Amino acid sequence: MRRRTVIVWVAGVAGLSGCLFADDRHDGPPELLGFGEIEVVIDGSSVDLSEDRFQAEHADNYSLAFHLHEGDDFWYMEGEEPVTFAEGIDALPYFAYEHASGADIVTYDGAVYDGRDPGTELTFLVDDDEVDPTQYVLSDGDDLHLEITTEG
């Protein structure tokens, strides 16, 4: 009976070793490059980014490069390289970002907000200063604010 216990224990430890120890493919956990606050406001209403569907723990399509976690209101950036504001928005579940004909275009929950459309304005702010989201590379502590307004 003791022999079976030892065999099961050794098999269990061997099975866990891939989760607990770094191998040739990984040098350890990704480095936290930064975190800060984020708010998205569409026509005066804040998007509740604390909903489970936006959190890395619950989302099917989250990115380590830029993501949210349950339990706080911060964005997190991990990985090899920092991302731009635009890349961060594009990495969030249920959001997409593109730049076309000199205009910002954000899709949220299937609704497209195109800066080329009359009456549609997208404003990207970092620490209350307007930035070009395709050029601004996020830094630790940045307070991000995306304001989308439409007429009608």
Residue ranges of model-derived segments:
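Ubiquitin-like/PB1-type beta-grasp interaction modules and other compact soluble beta-rich domains
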Residues: V8-W9, L20-G152
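N-terminal secretory signal peptides and thylakoid transit peptides that target proteins
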Residues: M1-A14
